[in-house]
């Protein structure tokens, strides 16, 4: 019997004395023919490579007990038919049950000694190929005795042993030797054939080609091999040999016939596909694979594989008889530790799945178990899955792998073969690893994974599913603020820019403390009434930088001639000279794009101007905040949605009229103001400015985008010229700004413009025309007559716009510290979003009101018709229809026109409406929940029955403060704080504050008596402190250090109590420290108490101002009870100097100074004692870790040496007298 050595070109032969096996298949030997004869050396003949013929035929003489499907049996049949064994070597049989590596090694060593003559002769044939040799060493001693039943029994045992070791011996690159061969190599008992095999790898390509041909022939001839006899070793055909060769990755210990001595000779040979020693064998390049041939044969392969699985062929791997015999594919057997130490296990795991359906083909007619087992498509455990027909390519690749040298094709075979053998769970494990590699190589294709195997497909699918990452939930990140190399902000929300400019925070200060600025602005926004409303406004483009620079450039006249030239009646002839302002809002860009569609002359200015007017009005509103420019923006706010529809005609004439030589600064601020004013008052200078802007808009889409804010202002001004001047006060409506800030920033402006409602009304009146105009612009470009008439009216009052322009220009430099500042630049467009949102809301409300009015008119018409019908008694139906038609006619055009007019902003308007509606519903639901909770906390009675003689002594932001007598004790005077829940900004805090006060009974905390919920008003009954607040004393008298110490001591006592209960007041200031006539001090206002003192109007208007807040609160950091200690320190400065630090600064700038300046500086520290300065420094430590707590401060010398409470009584009386005199 002859076996091919994979890398060794020299042939070796073994003769079986009991059988005459002939190698009729010289082609197996890479161009050499080996005939083993009785002599010690083999004959070597050079023959051309050719596929074997009739390799599947079996003879009747085949009586080997190996016919039960072992690969050895198949190979023996093949060689018996092909070539006669001329020689006979020692017949050595090995105990089949042992299967140990030691036994196989012993057998291998003996065989090596016997085949020395052949090996020595093989040395002379180094350049020759070698016939394929049987893979691995097999222990078949136990098979030489016993009858057929014994043979069957032995076979089953051997099968178990093979299955047991299948996972341990899975082949890998350079480790394809059987365990016996590996052991022999370890002991340096390597035959010359093996040495030559390691040295000569050049013949592998020829060998792989020949093996491939043999494989193909074997497949084709598979259906022809049929005799269902129990085959013997004599009848084993090349079919078996090819299967063993093809399953290079799954070489088995093959049991031989107990009476046959061939097994002993086979045990000393290695598979031709065996690369040799792992350390020395170099894998040759993979041979080329004929894909076409493989594909053409894939159908046959799949059929034969399926057939073999369908037959009753027993699988050697299905029982545990051969578990004792290790195979290369078995990685999980622990019987051969030396083999695992050979690095075979690591590589075998990667390649164990490559030997798949192999070359062995099942004869379709085979019925006998023995025959079918020999042709089972997979000869190794869990190596060959039954691959469906769609798996053709992988199957072919696998077969090619099997026929070619394992080392050369291992890269291709990785993960190709799926382990679908039902018995090999362990094998599947390694196979899945290989499949994972394959799928990763090919991009985890679903098709690839599915084709590799069902398991691999499921694995790959699961991997794909696991890779998916969910999107963020409830994400509210609206903008990322960064700082560029120049220290300017990038991505700063528009309203933030406006707030910074309005608050007087210079660009230099922003660059010095950029993070602090972002923190304080964020904090300021969080404390605004409706912080969520500002979310819509925070989206803008990075081109705001350019726009901001452009806005800053507005202070200078436009460089492009378009500004001066633009100003024609149509307003569309200007050149795109001033595109430096890019609209910050994406909405604006959309509008501009839509506007671009409009004709450049009329339609573009109108549409773009309407949309740009929206944008510009925001910019202008920013300026107006600094200046009286707000009226225009307010008009636009109310009109914003309708103006988007189509105020083209009004904007076009007005813009042309208003277009003027106005400088960019005047343009930017006055754009809204001047444009609105121009349209409302249309002074020539203002008109010139707005027309230039309008021309720029019409010049080009880009210029329009840049100028959209300008144009929008102009258009809107033209649309509703009359209301613009009064509309200035409407700016506070923008929820992004606090009422106090807006009022402080533009007190004069408020005076000049206080009628945003009329502007909106005018706008609403024009809304109907605007949609029509817009439609006409797209189609006929005809300007509606009503808008033109409206524009002329605005020009009549030119003086106000001129004043506004002058005021704006003068104020612009002040509030915008540097025209070049990016912040200032961005500031101008900042208002766009706010204005847009407010305009959306106002416009929607106006539209609803208009619809309601229309419905009322329709109703009146119907009633009138009905009355007429009653009088006539006939034609009622006609009258009804007429009334219905008349009614329908007016409303239909209005809604229809509105959508077209808002083609650019209609979608935005709808979205804003939906958002507003959702917010209203959410707010309503939340309010209901809060009210329900309050009902459970509050007393259900009527406070009017318990407390009488109510006298109002103060007014807070959400209600009044009253004094009353308790009916049960006339001498007991109580303070009642009445709050309208609808006006309370943070209703949810009321519940917590009531609960805190109920559980806080302390001499230094105002006692909470009761609370009532009456008709939507919350009544909080508290102890009355007749002395008033500490603010009265601070403002009307000068306090000594001893008196200041008393106030601090009593306040610290109350704070210590609150802090011990885990309550942080967070609003310690003089307004919340109350005194009685005896000088006793108590803390009040736990979040819902209104300010009683109306003397200092600034304090009242600055609800929620952070002058007493600790830096950690302003910087939005974590804070604890020590924030109250900082506030106490600020209150000490208030008692010393009469007001807290930064009181004259805007709230936002005060926040900035608190966050950046650290401990505030005293005006005259030298006049103070060491104790108070030390105490004050301890209270005002910026690092709260170094700041003292209430208990520590109570032990300070300044507190222990202070005056008595009675020392405050004179101050309280003086304050009351002065207050009474002031009231008189």
From Swiss-Prot:
Q: Where does this protein have compositionally biased stretches of type Pro residues?
A: 783-801
SUPFAM superfamilies given for it?
Protein kinase-like (PK-like) (SSF56112)
Q: Where does ATP bind?
A: 953-961, 977
Q: Can you list the GO cellular component terms from the UniProt entry?
A: cytoplasm; nucleus
Q: Where is the composition biased (Low complexity)?
A: 57-70, 95-119, 242-251, 343-375, 433-462, 664-677, 690-704, 730-743
Q: Where is the composition biased (Basic and acidic residues)?
A: 144-155, 608-622, 861-870
Query: Where is this chain compositionally biased, Gly residues type?
Result: 564-575
Q: InterPro entries annotated for this entry?
A: CRIB_dom (IPR000095), CRIB_dom_sf (IPR036936), Kinase-like_dom_sf (IPR011009), PAK3-like (IPR051931), PAK_BD (IPR033923), Prot_kinase_dom (IPR000719), Protein_kinase_ATP_BS (IPR017441), Ser/Thr_kinase_AS (IPR008271)
Sorted alphabetically, the Gene Ontology BP terms of this entry are: filamentous growth
Give TM regions. none
Presence of the UniProt keyword Acyltransferase in the record: no
Tell me its EC number(s), please. 2.7.11.1
Which key words tag this protein in UniProt?
A: ATP-binding, Cytoplasm, Kinase, Nucleotide-binding, Nucleus, Serine/threonine-protein kinase, Transferase
* Reaction catalyzed: L-seryl-[protein] + ATP = O-phospho-L-seryl-[protein] + ADP + H(+); L-threonyl-[protein] + ATP = O-phospho-L-threonyl-[protein] + ADP + H(+)
One Pfam family here = Pkinase
Q: Which compartment or compartments is the protein found in?
A: Cytoplasm; Nucleus
Active-site annotation: 1067 (proton acceptor)
Is the ATP-binding keyword given for this protein? yes
Q: Which residues form the CRIB domain?
A: 469-482
This chain belongs to the protein called Serine/threonine-protein kinase CST20
The encoding gene: CST20
């Amino acid at each position: 019997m002859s076996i091919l050595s994979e890398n060794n070109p020299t042939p070796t032969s073994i003769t079986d004395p009991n059988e005459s096996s002939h190698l009729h298949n010289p082609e197996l030997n890479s161009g050499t023919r080996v005939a083993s004869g009785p002599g010690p050396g083999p004959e070597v003949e050079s023959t051309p490579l050719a596929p074997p013929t009739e390799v599947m035929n079996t003879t009747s003489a085949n009586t080997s007990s190996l016919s039960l499907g072992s690969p050895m049996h198949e190979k023996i049949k093949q060689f018996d038919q092909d070539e006669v064994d001329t020689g006979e070597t020692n017949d050595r049989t090995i105990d089949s049950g042992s299967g140990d590596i030691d036994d196989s090694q012993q057998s291998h060593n003996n065989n090596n000694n016997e085949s020395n003559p052949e090996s020595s002769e093989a040395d002379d044939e180094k350049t020759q190929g070698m016939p394929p040799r049987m893979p691995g060493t097999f222990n078949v001693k136990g098979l030489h005795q016993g009858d057929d039943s014994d043979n069957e029994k032995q076979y089953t045992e051997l099968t178990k042993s093979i299955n047991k070791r299948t996972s341990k011996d899975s082949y890998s690159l350079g480790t394809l030797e059987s365990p016996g061969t590996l052991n022999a190599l370890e002991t340096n008992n390597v035959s010359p054939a093996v040495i030559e095999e390691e040295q000569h790898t050049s013949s592998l390509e020829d060998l792989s080609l020949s093996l491939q041909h043999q494989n193909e022939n074997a497949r084709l001839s598979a259906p022809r091999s049929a005799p269902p006899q129990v085959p013997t070793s004599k009848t084993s055909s090349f079919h078996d040999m090819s299967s063993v060769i093809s399953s290079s990755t799954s070489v088995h210990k093959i049991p031989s016939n107990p009476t046959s001595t061939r097994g002993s000779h086979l045990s000393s040979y290695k598979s031709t596909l065996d690369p040799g020693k792992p350390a020395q064998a170099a894998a040759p390049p993979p041979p080329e694979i004929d894909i076409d041939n493989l594909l053409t044969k894939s159908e046959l392969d799949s059929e034969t594989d399926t057939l073999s699985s369908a037959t009753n062929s027993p699988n050697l791997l299905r029982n545990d008889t051969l578990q004792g015999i290790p195979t290369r594919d078995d990685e999980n057997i622990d019987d051969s530790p030396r083999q695992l130490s050979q690095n075979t296990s690591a590589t075998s795991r990667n390649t164990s799945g490559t030997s798949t359906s192999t070359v062995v083909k099942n004869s379709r007619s085979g019925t006998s178990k023995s025959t079918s087992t020999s042709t089972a498509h997979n000869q190794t455990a869990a190596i060959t899955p039954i691959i469906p027909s769609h798996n053709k390519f992988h199957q072919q690749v696998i077969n090619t792998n099997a026929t070619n040298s394992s080392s050369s094709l291992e890269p291709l075979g990785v993960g190709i073969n799926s382990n679908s053998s039902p018995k090999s769970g362990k094998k599947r494990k390694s196979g899945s690893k290989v499949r994972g590699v394959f799928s990763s190589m090919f991009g985890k294709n679903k098709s690839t994974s599915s084709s590799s195997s069902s398991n691999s497909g499921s694995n790959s699918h699961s991997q794909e599913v696991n890779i998916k990452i969910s999107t963020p939930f409830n994400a509210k990140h609206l903008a990322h603020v960064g700082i560029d190399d120049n220290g300017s902000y990038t991505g700063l929300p528009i309203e933030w820019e406006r707030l910074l400019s309005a608050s007087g925070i210079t660009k230099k200060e922003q660059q010095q403390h950029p993070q602090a600025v972002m923190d304080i602005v964020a904090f300021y926004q969080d404390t605004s009434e409706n912080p969520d409303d500002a979310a819509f406004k925070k989206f803008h483009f990075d081109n705001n930088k350019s726009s901001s620079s452009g806005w800053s450039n507005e202070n200078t006249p436009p460089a492009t001639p378009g500004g001066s030239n633009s100003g024609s009646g149509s307003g569309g002839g200007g050149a795109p000279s001033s595109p430096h302002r890019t609209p910050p809002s994406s909405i604006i860009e959309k509008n501009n794009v839509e506007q671009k569609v409009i004709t450049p002359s009329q339609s573009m200015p109108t549409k773009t101007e309407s949309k740009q007017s929206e944008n510009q009005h925001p910019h202008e509103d920013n300026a107006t905040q600094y200046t009286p420019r707000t009226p225009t923006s307010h008009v636009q706010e109310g009109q914003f949605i309708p103006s988007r529809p189509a105020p083209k005609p009004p904007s076009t004439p007005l813009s042309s009229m208003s277009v003027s030589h106005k400088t960019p600064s005047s343009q930017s601020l006055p754009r809204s103001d001047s444009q609105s004013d121009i349209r409302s008052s249309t002074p020539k200078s203002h008109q010139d400015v707005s027309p230039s802007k309008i021309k720029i808009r019409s010049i080009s889409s880009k210029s329009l985008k840049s100028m959209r804010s300008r144009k929008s202002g102009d258009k809107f001004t033209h649309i509703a010229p009359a209301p613009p001047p009064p509309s200035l006060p409407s700016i506070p409506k923008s929820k992004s700004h606090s009422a106090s800030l807006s009022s402080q920033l533009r007190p004069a402006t408020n005076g000049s413009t206080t009628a945003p409602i009329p502007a909106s009304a005018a706008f609403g009146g024009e809304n109907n025309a605007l949609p029509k105009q817009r439609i006409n612009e797209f189609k006929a470009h005809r300007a509606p007559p009503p808008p033109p008439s409206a524009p002329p009216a605005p020009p009549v009052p030119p003086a106000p716009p001129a004043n506004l322009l002058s005021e704006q220009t003068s104020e612009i430099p002040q509030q915008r510290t540097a025209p070049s500042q990016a912040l200032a630049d961005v500031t101008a467009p900042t208002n766009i979003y706010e204005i847009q949102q407010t305009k959306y809301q106002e416009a929607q409300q106006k539209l609803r009101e208009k619809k309601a009015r229309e419905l009322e008119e329709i109703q009146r018409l119907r009633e009138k018709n009905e009355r007429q019908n009653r009088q006539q008694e006939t034609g009622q139906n006609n009258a009804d229809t007429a009334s219905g038609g008349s009614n329908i006619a007016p409303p239909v055009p209005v809604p229809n026109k509105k959508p077209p007019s808002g083609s650019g902003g209609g979608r935005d308007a709808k979205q804003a409406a939906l958002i507003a509606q959702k917010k209203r519903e959410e707010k309503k639901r939340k309010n209901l929940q809060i009210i329900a909770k309050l009902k459970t906390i509050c007393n259900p009675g009527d406070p009017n029955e318990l407390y009488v003689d109510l006298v109002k002594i103060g007014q807070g932001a959400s209600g009044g403060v009253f004094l009353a007598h308790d009916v049960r004790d006339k001498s007991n005077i109580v303070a009642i704080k009445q709050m309208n829940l609808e006006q309370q900004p943070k209703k949810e805090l009321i519940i917590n504050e009531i609960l805190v006060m109920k559980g806080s009974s302390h001499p230094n905390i105002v006692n909470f008596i009761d609370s009532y919920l009456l008709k939507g008003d919350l009544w909080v009954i508290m102890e009355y402190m007749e002395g008033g607040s500490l603010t009265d004393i601070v403002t009307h008298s000068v306090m000594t250090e001893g008196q200041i110490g008393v106030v601090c001591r009593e306040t610290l006592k109350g704070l210590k109590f609150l802090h011990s209960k885990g309550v942080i007041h967070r609003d310690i200031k003089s307004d919340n420290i109350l005194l009685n006539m005896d000088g006793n001090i108590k803390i009040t206002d736990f979040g819902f108490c209104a300010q009683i003192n109306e003397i200092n109007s600034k304090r009242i208007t600055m609800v929620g101002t952070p002058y007493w807040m600790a830096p950690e609160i302003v910087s939005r950091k974590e804070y604890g009870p020590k924030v109250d200690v900082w506030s106490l320190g600020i209150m000490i400065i208030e008692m010393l100097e009469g007001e807290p630090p930064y009181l004259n600064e805007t709230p936002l700038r005060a926040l900035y100074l608190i966050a950046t300046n650290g401990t505030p500086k005293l005006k005259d520290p030298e006049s103070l004692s060491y104790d108070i300065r030390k105490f004050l420094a301890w209270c005002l430590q910026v690092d709260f870790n170094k700041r003292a707590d209430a208990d520590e401060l109570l032990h300070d010398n300044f507190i222990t040496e202070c005056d008595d409470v009675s020392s405050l009584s004179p101050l309280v009386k003086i304050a009351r007298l002065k207050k009474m005199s002031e009231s008189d």
